[in-house]
Structure formats: structure tokens, C-alpha cells
Amino acid sequence: MKTGRIIRSLSGYYDIQLPSGDIQRTRARGEFRKSKQKPLVGDFVDFESENDEGFIWAIHERENFLVRPPIANIDIAVIVTAAKEPDFAPNLLDRQLVALEAANVRPLIYFSKMDLLEKSEHEKINHVANYYQSIGYDVIFSDSKSAFEALKMMLKDHVSVFMGQTGAGKSTLLNHLSPQLGLETGEVSKALSRGKHTTRQVTLIEVDEALIADTPGFSSYEVFDFPVEELDDYFPEFVEKRQDCRFRGCLHLNEPGCAIKEAVAVGTITQSRYNSYKAFYELIKAQKPKYKTDN
């Protein structure tokens, strides 16, 4: 029995990388289909192989996983966020952050297209970035001379996934990190202010001393798969202050003595973050019940 990490999934086949660096192509045994458990890119698995044919026998316990895209055991998720063209969208960034917090994946915010900003716009984005840094998130700017080196150092020895608003420059950033990737960059539609989807499959690619995934289906989050009562768990600044709310289980909406609303009133918590919280609360309340299945 051998052990390795799945680095590619394509049409029912799984390419597994061994500790030696060798790659073995395998398929999943029928038992996985019966149990509705599917191997994911990033999974550590036990498998057997003979005559260039292999079969996966067991999937190791996952540290975390994402559904869109299907990938497991991610160390860092780089959120490529456009500062302009398309305009910065705080609600979308917050949605991505909440989804990553819920999945127990460490986010890193990368502001792209900083060179397109006027001075006043630059100051505004700096103010926004300072707030996200103050609540514990790592932030990198595309116009920093040391940006790429800083990003490479943070990705070293880690598995990372790149995500972001369509047209934000995700593939452009990946091509800067590793020109040999040769990823197609989609032009932004001026009519829709959205980019063309150009990525087709989930693959982990070795870049220097990191494993990087460029993946499809990461332009938005349609649902949050957790109870509405857990929403404030995924806003770090809320976790710190909610203990001062008058009522235990405060939802930070209409309750008197809410420490979160008081913090918003004095500017300790930004209005945009609170607006995102309220929008996500309504989104979760409006969602139809979802029955979980194993992944």
C-alpha cells in the first residue's frame, strides 16, 4: 500500500503525487461511490498500483475542504480582490472571508490593480486594508515592490488556493508567480463588468516550494452551509466584542444593549462589515434547508 496526495482530478481519474515526487494515475474503488464519499484534490490517500493502474483504498482525515471548488487540506486561500475595474466590492470580499472562516481555511487578501487608482482612491483602499489587518487578516498590495516576494514567502511549503472576483486578475497574478503556468487571462466585459471564466480544471501545481491550485467556480458564494446563529463566529471583530452584549445569544440586529451595534456607532467596527453581516443574516434565513452529504 502506498500513500500520497491527489494533485489532479479529471474524468474519474486521480493523479497522486508520492513523497518521492513521482506521480501515479489511479481510480477510486466502487465503495467510495456507494458511500457517497468522493476523493478530492488535496486529499492524502492510501492506494495500490500495478502495471500503471492504481486504485484508491482509503482517504485520510481532512484538515478542511471546500465545495466550490472541490479541494481539501488547504493551508492558505489567496483572495484576489480588485481595487478597480471592477470596483472594490466589500460585500463580496466579506462573503469570501466568512466562507473561508467557516471552512477553517486561512485567508490572505491580495489587492490587485492598485496602479489604476487615483491618489484619493488609493487612500480609501489603504484605509480599508488597515481595517482588515486590524482584525487579523494578512493583506498584500499589488503595487508594492516586495509584493510578489512577500507572497512567495507566505506560500512556501503550503498548499494554497487562489480565488476572487471575476476579472480581478487572478490568472495574471498566478502567471507573475510562475510564468510557466501560461494561464489564459480573461478580458473583462465592459457591459457586465465581469470576466470570462477561463479556468477549466482543479490541479495542484508545484511553484518553487509551494503547491498552488488555480480553480474554476470561485467567483461567488451562493449559500452559507451553517446555522444563522453561527454567523458572528466568522466575523473576528464580533467574536471579541459580543461578550459585552446585554443578552446571551444576541443576533446584533434589534436587541437592546448590543455591543456590536454600539461598536458600529462609534466606528470601532466599520459600517460596511456590519452591512455585510446583516445581508448574510438575511441570506441564510432565506435559504432552503440543505441536507449534508459526505464529501
UniProtKB/Swiss-Prot annotation:
Its EC number is 3.6.1.-. Zn(2+) binds at C245, C250, H252, C258. Pfam families: RsgA_GTPase, RsgA_N. Binds 1 zinc ion per subunit. Residues 63-221 form the CP-type G domain. It is found in: Cytoplasm. Its cofactor is Zn(2+). InterPro entries: G_CP_dom (IPR030378), NA-bd_OB-fold (IPR012340), P-loop_NTPase (IPR027417), Ribosome_biogen_GTPase_RsgA (IPR004881), RsgA_GTPase_dom (IPR010914), RsgA_N (IPR031944). One of its GO terms (biological process) is ribosomal small subunit biogenesis. Disulfide bonds: none annotated. GO terms for cellular component: cytoplasm. GTP binds at S112, K113, M114, D115, G164, Q165, T166, G167, A168, G169, K170, S171, T172. The keyword Metal-binding applies. HAMAP family: GTPase_RsgA. Monomer. Associates with 30S ribosomal subunit, binds 16S rRNA. One of several proteins that assist in the late maturation steps of the functional core of the 30S ribosomal subunit. Helps release RbfA from mature subunits. May play a role in the assembly of ribosomal proteins into the subunit. Circularly permuted GTPase that catalyzes slow GTP hydrolysis, GTPase activity is stimulated by the 30S ribosomal subunit. This is Small ribosomal subunit biogenesis GTPase RsgA.
